[in-house]
Design a protein with these regions (language model features):
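PLP-dependent aminotransferase class I/II
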Residues: 27-32, 50, 200-285
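PLP-dependent aminotransferase-like
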Residues: 84-143
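Short acidic capping loops at alpha-helix termini that bridge into adjacent secondary structure
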Residues: 65-69, 177, 199-200
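Short loop-beta-helix segment that forms the pyridoxal 5′-phosphate
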Residues: 47, 59-81, 94
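Conserved PLP-binding catalytic core of the aspartate aminotransferase-like
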Residues: 267, 277-308
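N-terminal "arm"/small-domain region of PLP-dependent enzymes with the aminotransferase-like
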Residues: 1-45, 137, 171
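PLP-dependent enzyme catalytic core of the Aspartate aminotransferase-like
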Residues: 157, 306-307, 316-358
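Active-site phosphate-binding strand-loop segment of PLP-dependent enzymes
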Residues: 120-183
Length: 358
């Protein structure tokens, strides 16, 4: 099983500017901070069971049915409760992808098979995936769209073909759309409109990245199969979504201008960063999200930390070796600092080697 390591360890590297965690570069909205402050008056009461008002706000924001919703203590909480509820015996996971899927599945004794994403295909899922499903016959699959750490989306035609294959084969399909808000035209990549027709589809989302509130822990999921949601709630601890998280979520959902402003910054800065990184000889992949996946010198993580920059070393992801990294897209002044440090720590031999590596 993969060692449990994530980005965002600012406590261990408290002297560093953090590019390892991928959140909205504008930071937490002031209205959300105020909602958390105001919720202090309610701390003497238990949190609202079922998150009724929050679910109504999410349903309105996502243009879906409240009955399809379940809320959790972050997306990770829902991944674990779904695994406990379904208790699958075999899963097929892309490699590389978000580590929490495997952590949750292994915790319930599930066998893991991997679909390895290849560098020569820019780490994209290929058209053979439906055939692999038929051959492997898993009980459940997890697909991250866009994928983490690569930032690549799955083509909508292929995604729908996978969904249809899963329905025909009796495979439960989980699509993690936590980073979908940061790609261009996210409505062209979501499967939300397929929920009613496909009860074996679960879509995962979170407030963490969109509103830069990883410390709050608030996620949600959609599924049209009420039995699945009931089973998840049955294996989840009571009051798993705090009063502060519920109030923060309702305030955050009103911040549409903030979300769009963050998106525009990401689109502009991502293009600028990719060009600068390529000029440094780094191998940059076509990430579509609010982070950039690239290949460089094997010692780059340590060199950057020494210069006060924390990047995500992706070598602990299955399917990746030493030299693969991920960096968040932040505000321009911060991104300039990253590029400055990357240039400082790149030896001439590194630049030459990186241009032809992988």
């Amino acid at each position: 099983m993969t060692k449990h390591i994530h980005g965002g360890d600012v406590y261990k590297y408290d002297h560093c500017l953090d590019f390892s965690a991928n959140c909205n570069p504008l930071g937490t909205p002031q209205s959300v901070k105020q909602a958390i402050i105001d919720s202090v008056e309610d701390l003497s009461d238990y949190p609202r069971v079922g998150c009724g008002p929050l679910k109504e706000a999410i349903a309105d924001y996502e243009h879906t049915k409240k009955e399809y919703l379940i809320c959790g203590n972050g997306a990770a909480d829902l991944i674990f409760s779904l695994s406990r509820a379904l208790n699958p015996k075999k899963a097929l996971l892309p490699a590389p992808t978000f580590a929490e899927y495997e952590q949750a599945l292994v915790s319930v004794g599930c066998e893991i098979s991997r679909y390895y994403l290849k560098e020569e295909n820019d780490f994209c899922i290929q058209k053979d995936y439906p055939d692999v499903l038929k051959r492997e016959k898993p009980d459940i699959i997890f697909l991250c769209n866009p994928n983490n750490p690569t930032g690549i989306t799955i083509s909508q035609d292929l995604l729908e073909e996978i969904l249809e294959t899963c329905a025909m084969q009796g495979i439960f399909m989980v699509v993690d759309e936590c980073f979908l808000d940061f790609v261009k035209d996210p409505q062209k990549h979501t499967l939300k409109e397929k929920l009613e027709k496909y009860p074996g589809l679960f879509i995962l989302k979170a407030f963490t990245k969109r509103y830069a509130i990883p410390g709050v822990r608030l996620g949600y999921g959609f599924c049209s199969d009420r039995e699945v949601l009931d089973r998840m709630e049955a294996v989840t601890q009571p009051w798993n979504v705090s009063t502060m998280a519920q109030q923060a979520g309702m305030a955050a959902l009103k911040e549409s201008e903030y979300v769009e402003a963050g998106r525009q910054i990401i689109f502009r800065e991502s293009a600028w960063m990719k060009e600068k990184m390529r000029q440094l000889g780094l191998t940059v992949y076509p990430s579509e999200a609010n982070y950039i996946f690239f290949y460089g010198p094997e010692e780059l993580f340590e060199r950057c930390v020494a210069k006060g920059i924390l990047i995500r070393d992706c070598s602990n992801y299955p399917g990746l070796k030493k030299g693969y990294y991920r960096v968040a897209v932040k505000l321009h002044e911060q991104n300039e600092k990253l590029i400055e440090v990357l240039e400082e720590v790149q030896a001439p031999s590194d630049k030459l080697r990186s241009s032809y590596s992988v």
